[in-house]
């Protein structure tokens, strides 16, 4: 024993040293190595058992348990049978004798180690493993311990990790399922006995003034009088130990429900018991008070043990935790979409009982409003309850709605109260998501049963009307100022939205869904609110005071400023709402809802012109930090709302183009009048961009013939082509040039080709681009300036000009031939100049990237218009310039600019190799040479994915669109030959490309892996790649082997399904060869397995040829191979003493 005591003292000393703050990292590594070596010895467990029995040092205890854990999970096969029996006998005894004195985390770890033994040996060698757990639960003094063991067993055995064979996993699951009825019965008994013991009969309280309605509702929800009575009784007071037992039991149930199927084992009695505990969470008083003391002892838990009785009741925040755990159990049941027919009645019972709780939560009393009650509940409980409601609506409403025993309309009434009394913004938005799910359900139901539309809408109309009114009120400061001012409108989240924008977007989505169901009512409600706030805004012109050239808004009183601020914020929100509803006025309902849409559009045009004329956005105000942003936002939102109606305006134009277009012309002309004052570098960018976007939409979507003749649009033309005018911000400049170019390039709708006036428009467009490229064309024949300042100025001219031109090209790339011809005629000189300047700026990454982006747009949109000679000249120039040295310089330089240059170049080549004609075919050898000889060696071993994605896409497109470069035979010939023995050309290049794809599967980057795997699959489906003789004989075994190794090493686990399908497609080329030759050869080459294990793996791989069975066999092979390797890990020789 001396050696054990000495070792214990040494271990305690080492542990203290390891965790001491002055111990160096080097010394820690030495200690760690020593401890690891000690743990690897087969006899180490004896010392560790002594440490567990004798030590009180938590570090020592955890280390000792980790040694057992390692022994059981990684070395168990090598442990002699006699020692296994000793361990299986000793550890449970140790747990039983010391569980009350051990810290909880040590006790939990010891339970886990014992369960790990059960995972390995139950039932063959550890036949009483589960029986012992059940006995622990049934013995009052060890009930908590038994429940911890049960939960751990559920976690570790039902869904075990990959350190077990598939057969063992299936066996464990089957064994556990056999125990489920017994376990659920036991848990029901534990919970019921504690509940019944602590329940007290309370005197019936007098009815509250608000009780009658809710009692009627309760009787509607629950049709079982006894159950209603039970649920209405006051909850019992539980002492701390009973709380703990109940919490453990509910945790067990929650985990069991996560994996067991719905069945009769989940009895009505169990469900009722769970709901008893769920009630504890909706006791509004539980956040701030504790239960009265009780004289009951803990004998129900402790049995005849000598533990002293616990007289103090547990704090009710712990009772609230029981409510949270009970709701977790209910939600685990609710999230199961597959509900057996025999469980439908149980499902109804679950819903009825939960909505009893909802009724309790939303009941108003003299002492508590609904909001106060929700504020006093545990936040976690409210979250769980909201989760339940979401699951009910999204998964089960379709099952329950038609059941006469479930009053859906009354449920919606409760949900309404629950939603609009949420104490937090997050809680409210979560509830809005539930309403959105309900509205989607209703919309889909109506689409599938159009003949019942009126009946369905009629049933829910009152609820929808109330919902719309309240949601609109909630986004208005007039009704909800206190809460709305809490929302952050500055910090952006991951979706680039502020908290306020997210709140508004959620709300408007609900409004839009109601609009689809109740269009007339929704529109009238919204438009009335909009009109009310517009009157305030339009009336501001009466409050203007002029002082010389300056104007001031004469609203100075603090209360008036506050009211104006609220009204402007509300107007901004309502304008966004009106814009969001634009889609509900087009399509089949255009005619029916025309008058409503016309009212909106005319009002929006009036507002935008008003804002631009009196320039409220430039006014001096009493509170400039508040009111000025409000005025700017209203003006910007009015422009954005009008832009949202551009598709409606396009439809309106097509209806009146040939007859009585005067009203339409007036609308467009008036709207355009609002723009020129805003097209200025002095105007706030938010407002400027809104004006630009509106012009783009009118020019691109509506395309009126008369747009170019409107004086306001001609003013914008003059502003943008005036070389002396101050340049606008970059984004605004690009948008305006796009709009003006589209005015001239896009064909007018419903106008014959002969009346499109292309000649005149072409001349105007040439003048426009000449003006925009004036400074750029002055660079012709020049070389880059030597002085840094001049060079930067020149680069700025190049980048700004090419950015505008690229945008112009991209926006007409999908248009007809005439538009593209006209565009290229205007661009021809700039294109030639760009190619001439390219070599001079090859070392300026930012300029080169912009030039390549421009040429990429030309190739994608105007390839035909450029003509073969010029395109060939461009390609040849690029191929000459991008030497291996230049590519290396670009890729290896600091930052990502150089990589972007190469990626843009590869994108251009992608367009080239996809060209169907023969014009660019002569470039294929040069492109392949550049890719595989110059570029690939530079990036192959770089861990960074930069450039790789574009390179492999280029190689894929080259193969896909130029298959006959490698396989020249006709389609008919390849069919007759079955594709496997076609004559091949350029074989060496093909092999090099395939090797590059294969090499990419050995790289860690998952995106490249997924991309390239999909490319191979596409080449197989389109060109039978896997069937080609060269691939089949030389490459296919290597690819399958690599993919299987990837699965075995778990390096790309997210792609398990895709890899399995790819292996199947490769194997299906010749299943016989795969089963008889490849699989045995693959297993023979696998390291770390003995011969018998390889035979078992081969035997277990079922020779079935359908995809599901085959991929299941693949994943079984991978799992079991990993398991065998784990079992075979050899132990290091020698003994290490502490």
From Swiss-Prot:
Residues 31-97 form the Importin N-terminal domain. Its main location: nucleus. It is found in: Nucleus; Cytoplasm. Keywords: Cytoplasm, Nucleus, Protein transport, Transport. SUPFAM superfamilies: ARM repeat. It comes from the Eukaryota. One of its GO terms (molecular function) is small GTPase binding. Residues 291-307 have a biased composition (Low complexity). InterPro entries: ARM-like (IPR011989), ARM-type_fold (IPR016024), Exportin-1/Importin-b-like (IPR013598), Importin-beta_N (IPR001494), XPO6 (IPR040016). Residues 291-315 are annotated as: Disordered. One of its GO terms (cellular component) is cytoplasm. GO terms for biological process: protein export from nucleus. PANTHER family: EXPORTIN-6 (PTHR21452:SF4). Belongs to the exportin family. Mediates the nuclear export of actin and profilin-actin complexes in somatic cells. Oocyte nuclei lack active actin export. This is Exportin-6-B.
């Amino acid at each position: 024993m001396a050696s054990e005591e000495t070792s214990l003292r040494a271990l305690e000393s080492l542990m203290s040293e390891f965790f001491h703050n002055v111990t160096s990292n080097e010394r820690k590594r030495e200690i760690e190595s020593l401890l690891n070596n000690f743990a690897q010895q087969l006899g180490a467990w004896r010392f560790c058992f002594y440490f567990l029995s004798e030590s009180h040092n938590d570090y020592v205890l955890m280390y000792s348990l980790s040694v057992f854990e390692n022994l059981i999970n990684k070395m168990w096969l090598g442990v002699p049978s006699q020692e296994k029996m000793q361990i299986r006998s000793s550890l449970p005894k140790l747990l039983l004798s010391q569980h009350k004195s051990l810290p909880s985390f040590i006790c939990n770890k010891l339970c886990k180690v014992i369960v790990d033994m059960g995972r390995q040996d139950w039932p063959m060698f550890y036949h009483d493993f589960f029986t012992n757990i059940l006995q622990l639960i049934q013995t009052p003094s060890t009930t908590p311990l038994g429940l911890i063991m049960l939960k751990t067993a559920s976690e570790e055995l039902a869904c075990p990790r990959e350190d077990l064979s598939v057969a063992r996993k299936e066996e464990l699951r089957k064994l556990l399922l056999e125990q489920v009825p017994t376990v659920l019965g036991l848990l029901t008994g534990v919970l019921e006995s504690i509940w019944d013991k602590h329940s007290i009969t309370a005197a019936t309280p007098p009815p509250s003034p608000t009780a009658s309605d809710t009692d009627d509702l309760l009787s509607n929800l629950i049709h079982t009088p006894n159950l209603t009575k039970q649920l209405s009784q006051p909850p019992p007071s539980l002492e701390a130990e009973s709380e703990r037992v109940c919490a453990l039991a509910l945790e067990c149930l929650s985990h069991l429900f996560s994996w067991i199927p719905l069945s009769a084992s989940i009895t009505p009695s169990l469900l009722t018991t769970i709901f008893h505990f769920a009630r504890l969470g909706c006791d509004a008083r539980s956040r701030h008070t504790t239960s009265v003391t009780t004289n009951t002892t803990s004998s129900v838990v402790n049995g005849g043990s000598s533990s002293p009785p616990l007289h103090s009741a547990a704090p009710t925040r712990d009772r609230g935790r029981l409510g949270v755990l009970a709701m977790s159990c209910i939600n685990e049941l609710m999230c199961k979409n597959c509900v057996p027919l025999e469980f439908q009645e149980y499902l109804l019972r679950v819903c009825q009982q939960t909505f009893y709780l909802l009724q309790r939560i939303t009941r108003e009393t003299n002492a508590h409003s609904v909001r106060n009650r929700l504020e006093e509940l545990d936040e976690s409980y409210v979250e769980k309850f909201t989760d339940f409601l979401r699951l009910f609506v999204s998964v089960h409403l379709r099952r329950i709605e038609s059941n006469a025993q479930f009053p859906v309309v009354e449920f919606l009434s409760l949900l309404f109260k629950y939603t609009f009394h949420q104490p937090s913004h997050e809680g409210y938005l979560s509830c809005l998501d539930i309403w959105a799910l309900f509205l989607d359900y209703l919309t889909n139901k109506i689409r599938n049963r159009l003949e019942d539309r009126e009946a369905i809408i009629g049933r829910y109309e009152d609820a929808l009307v109330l919902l719309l009114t309240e949601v609109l009120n909630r986004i208005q400061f007039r009704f909800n100022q206190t809460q709305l001012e809490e929302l952050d409108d500055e910090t952006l989240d991951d979706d680039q939205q502020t908290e306020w924008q997210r709140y508004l977007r959620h709300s408007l989505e609900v409004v839009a869904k109601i609009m689809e169901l109740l269009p007339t009512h929704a529109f009238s409600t919204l438009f009335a609110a909009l009109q009310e706030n517009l009157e305030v805004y339009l009336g501001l012109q009466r409050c203007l005071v002029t002082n010389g050239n300056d104007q001031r808004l004469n609203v100075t009183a603090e209360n008036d400023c506050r009211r104006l601020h609220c009204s402007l914020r509300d107007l901004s929100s309502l304008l966004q709402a009106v814009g969001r509803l634009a889609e509900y006025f087009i399509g089949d309902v255009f005619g029916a809802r025309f008058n409503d849409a016309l009212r909106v559009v005319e009002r929006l045009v009036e507002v935008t012109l008003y804002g631009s004329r009196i320039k409220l956005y430039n006014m001096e105000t009493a509170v400039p930090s508040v009111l000025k942003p409000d005025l700017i936002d209203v003006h910007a939102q009015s422009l954005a709302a009008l832009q949202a109606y551009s598709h409606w305006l396009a439809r309106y134009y097509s209806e009146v183009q040939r007859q009585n277009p005067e009203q339409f012309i007036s609308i467009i002309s008036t709207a355009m009048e609002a723009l020129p004052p805003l097209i200025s570098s002095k105007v706030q960018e938010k407002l400027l961009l809104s004006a630009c976007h509106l012009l783009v939409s009118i020019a691109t979507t509506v395309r009126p013939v008369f747009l170019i003749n409107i004086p306001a649009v001609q003013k914008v033309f003059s502003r943008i082509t005036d070389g002396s005018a101050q340049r606008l911000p970059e984004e605004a400049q690009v948008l305006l040039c796009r709009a003006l170019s589209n005015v001239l390039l896009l064909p007018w709708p419903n106008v014959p080709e002969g009346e499109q006036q292309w000649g005149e428009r072409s001349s105007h467009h040439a003048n426009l681009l000449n003006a925009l490229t004036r400074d750029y064309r002055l660079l012709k024949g020049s070389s880059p300036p030597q002085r840094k300042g001049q060079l930067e100025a020149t680069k700025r001219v190049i980048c700004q000009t090419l950015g505008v031109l690229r945008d112009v090209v991209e926006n007409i790339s999908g248009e007809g031939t005439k538009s593209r011809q006209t565009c290229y005629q205007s661009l021809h000189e700039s294109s030639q100049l760009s190619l001439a300047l390219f070599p001079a700026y090859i070392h300026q990454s930012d300029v080169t990237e912009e030039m390549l982006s421009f040429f990429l747009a030309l190739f994608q949109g105007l390839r035909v218009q450029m003509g073969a000679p010029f395109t060939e000249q461009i390609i040849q120039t690029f191929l000459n310039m991008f030497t291996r040295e230049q590519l290396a310089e670009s890729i290896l330089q600091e930052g990502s600019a150089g990589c972007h240059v190469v990626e843009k170049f590869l994108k251009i080549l992608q367009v080239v190799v996809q060209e169907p004609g023969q014009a660019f075919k002569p470039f294929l050898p040069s492109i392949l040479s550049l890719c595989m000889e110059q570029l690939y060696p530079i990036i192959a071993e770089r861990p960074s994915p930069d450039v790789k994605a574009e390179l492999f896409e280029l190689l894929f497109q080259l193969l896909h669109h130029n298959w006959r470069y490698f396989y020249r035979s006709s389609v008919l010939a390849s069919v007759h030959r079955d594709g496997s023995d076609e004559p091949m050309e350029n074989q060496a290049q093909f092999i090099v490309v395939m090797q590059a794809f294969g090499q990419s599967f050995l790289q860690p980057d998952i995106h490249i892996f997924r991309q390239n795997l999909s490319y191979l699959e596409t080449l197989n489906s389109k060109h039978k790649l896997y069937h080609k003789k060269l691939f089949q004989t030389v490459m296919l075994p290597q690819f399958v082997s690599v993919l299987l190794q990837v699965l075995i090493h778990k390096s790309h686990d997210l792609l398990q399904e895709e890899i399995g399908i790819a292996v199947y497609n490769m194997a299906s080329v010749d299943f016989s060869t795969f089963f008889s030759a490849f699989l045995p050869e693959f297993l023979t080459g696998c390291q770390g397995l003995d011969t018998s294990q390889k035979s078992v793996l081969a035997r277990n791989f079922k020779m079935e040829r359908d995809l599901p069975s085959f991929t299941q066999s693949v994943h079984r092979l991978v799992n079991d191979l990993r398991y065998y390797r784990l079992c075979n890990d050899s132990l290091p020789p020698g003994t290490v003493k502490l």
